């Protein structure tokens, strides 16, 4: 349960208590239950229509939130995962392969978080090593060779900052991905499904179209990190989350991303099938527009998109 959901939890407890009492004592409490369920629905809508940035940060980090592989199973047909960077090893924190979107062959890549403690250790909590980014680039170049559109799912706190990752060239692997992705001659569509953290997110995020789920975040640093750096107090992370403009609605307004995909009431984890359906519709729409461009036009479109991000004022 998240902090802002406490009022909902209290109503749910009352509903459960009434249902238990109704069953145990063989009394009719359905009218009271119906009233509370209606109240729960109203309160849920009220809370989720007025989420604050820090609330969305909590939702983006939720363990129950659907992962890249969850969405792949719903959206793409006959997906085959491909492994390894052909240089060092396979990285379970970065998954990728080929499948079909509406009958069209495509390449799909994304960071993969774990579902539980054991899986998170195996997936390194979705924080890829250099070999993960090199695997992603290998699959992108393969997609370009065979003319397949590329879809990437961004879901990471950041690239893994460990000693071994740095020794194997973490920053170089990400930098190379940025350069190579900028010039790909096939459509590239990226979607932030949870946290989009810093260079770790950008390493698979240089796309013609960048989309975000309604309760995802995209930032150069975590709110806690920003608060610690700016104000020497990580407890000010709520203020940092608001100041940094890291939520999907804010980034859409700032023209850093192209579109926001709405989530089911309560978050993507409440109805994965519905969320996947909305993502598939958005992917199909964006791809149909990008397929009107030739290879060089796609590369130029991508380059110009990122050139236009940001502004400054002279005084």
Curated annotation (Swiss-Prot):
It catalyses: N(6)-carboxybiotinyl-L-lysyl-[protein] + acetyl-CoA = N(6)-biotinyl-L-lysyl-[protein] + malonyl-CoA. GO terms for cellular component: acetyl-CoA carboxylase complex. Component of the acetyl coenzyme A carboxylase (ACC) complex. First, biotin carboxylase catalyzes the carboxylation of biotin on its carrier protein (BCCP) and then the CO(2) group is transferred by the carboxyltransferase to acetyl-CoA to form malonyl-CoA. It is an enzyme of class 2 (transferase). It is found in: Cytoplasm. InterPro entries: Acetyl_CoA_COase_a_su (IPR001095), ClpP/crotonase-like_dom_sf (IPR029045), COA_CT_C (IPR011763). Pathway: Lipid metabolism; malonyl-CoA biosynthesis; malonyl-CoA from acetyl-CoA: step 1/1. It comes from Staphylococcus carnosus (strain TM300). Residues 32-289 form the CoA carboxyltransferase C-terminal domain. HAMAP family: AcetylCoA_CT_alpha. Its EC number is 2.1.3.15. The gene is accA. It comes from the Bacteria. Disulfide bonds: none annotated. This is Acetyl-coenzyme A carboxylase carboxyl transferase subunit alpha. GO terms for biological process: fatty acid biosynthetic process; malonyl-CoA biosynthetic process. Belongs to the AccA family. Keywords: ATP-binding, Cytoplasm, Fatty acid biosynthesis, Fatty acid metabolism, Lipid biosynthesis, Lipid metabolism, Nucleotide-binding, Transferase. SUPFAM superfamilies: ClpP/crotonase. Acetyl-CoA carboxylase is a heterohexamer composed of biotin carboxyl carrier protein (AccB), biotin carboxylase (AccC) and two subunits each of ACCase subunit alpha (AccA) and ACCase subunit beta (AccD). GO terms for molecular function: acetyl-CoA carboxylase activity; ATP binding; carboxyl- or carbamoyltransferase activity. NCBIfam families: accA (TIGR00513), AccA_sub (NF041504), PRK05724.1 (NF004344).
């Amino acid at each position: 349960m998240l902090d802002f959901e406490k009022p909902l939890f209290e109503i749910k407890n009352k509903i459960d208590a009434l249902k238990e009492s109704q069953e145990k004592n063989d009394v009719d409490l359905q009218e009271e239950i119906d009233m509370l369920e209606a109240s729960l629905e109203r309160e849920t809508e009220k809370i989720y229509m007025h989420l604050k940035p820090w609330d969305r940060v909590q939702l983006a980090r939720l363990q129950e939130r659907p992962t890249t592989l969850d969405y792949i199973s719903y959206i793409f047909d006959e997906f085959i995962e491909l492994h390894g960077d052909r240089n060092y090893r396979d990285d379970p924190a970065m998954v990728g392969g080929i499948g079909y979107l509406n009958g069209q062959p495509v390449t799909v890549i994304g960071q993969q978080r774990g579902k539980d403690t054991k899986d998170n250790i195996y997936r390194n909590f979705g924080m890829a090593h250099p070999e993960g980014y090199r695997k992603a680039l290998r699959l992108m170049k393969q997609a370009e060779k065979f003319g397949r559109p590329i879809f990437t799912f961004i879901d990471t706190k950041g690239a893994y900052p460990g000693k071994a990752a740095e020794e194997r060239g973490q920053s170089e692997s990400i930098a190379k991905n940025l350069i190579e992705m900028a010039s790909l001659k096939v459509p590239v569509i990226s979607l932030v499904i949870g946290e989009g953290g810093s260079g770790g997110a950008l390493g698979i995020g240089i796309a013609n179209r960048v989309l975000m789920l309604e309760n995802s975040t995209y930032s150069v640093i975590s709110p806690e990190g920003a608060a610690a750096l700016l104000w020497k107090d990580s407890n000010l992370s709520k203020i940092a989350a608001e100041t940094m403009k890291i939520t999907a609605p804010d980034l859409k307004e700032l023209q850093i991303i192209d579109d926001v995909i709405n989530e089911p009431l309560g978050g993507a984890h409440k109805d994965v099938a519905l969320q996947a359906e909305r993502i598939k519709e958005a992917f199909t729409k964006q791809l149909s527009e990008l397929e009107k461009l030739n290879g060089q036009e796609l590369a130029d479109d991508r380059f110009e998109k990122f050139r236009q991000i940001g502004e400054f004022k002279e005084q």
